[in-house]
Amino acid sequence: MTMQYDVKSAHNTVSGVAVNYRARLKGVLISPSTAVTYNTSFCNNVSLSGTYDVPGSTTCTVTIANHGLSNGDRVYLNFTSGTAQDEAYTVANVATNTFTVTVASATTSGNVTMYADILAEFDCSNGTSFYTLIPGEGILAPNGIYVGIPNVAITTTLFYG
């Protein structure tokens, strides 16, 4: 194996597509501006859309046709309307077109976009920036890289090739 010289970077201040073509995630720099517990997700850029409902509890029911999930799977949910928190969740109570996740207590509903192929998740609970090098050739993202940043003051720089 020879050295790869064509490593590039992408900087994100909000959730979104960082790379829109096949790439390998090589490393990540996460820079929080405040000490708060959060999870940042890097996903293969393939999504499914649907709806969600949180009826005044901590149970969020997500409806996405033929989602293909199993109990215990981790998914990144981008709630595109309503007030639910965008982040990675563990799936439960799976049926063909629905599943549930546990959220902060709320009464809200709306639209959601799901990324079911999480390449890497990073947790942090202080205001210190940190870098993570992905070993070997990196993690393959066949359809590009979507970055899921929580609703806090944080930026990411990812390195890919």
PLM regions: where:
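Noncatalytic modules at the cell exterior or secretory-pathway interfaces
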Residues: 26-28, 138-152
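Short proline/glycine- and polar residue-rich coil/turn motifs
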Residues: 93-95, 123-130
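Short edge beta-strand/loop segments characteristic of extracellular beta-sandwich folds
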Residues: 27-31, 65
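Small/polar beta-strand repeat architecture
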Residues: 46-117
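Short, surface-exposed beta-strand/strand-loop-strand elements in extracellular ectodomains
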Residues: 35-47, 116-122, 156-161
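C-terminal interaction-tip segments
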Residues: 1-23, 33, 149-161
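Exposed aromatic-hydrophobic patches
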Residues: 63, 130-138
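Short beta-strand/loop motifs in extracellular/secreted proteins, especially
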Residues: 26, 36-40, 71-75, 154-156
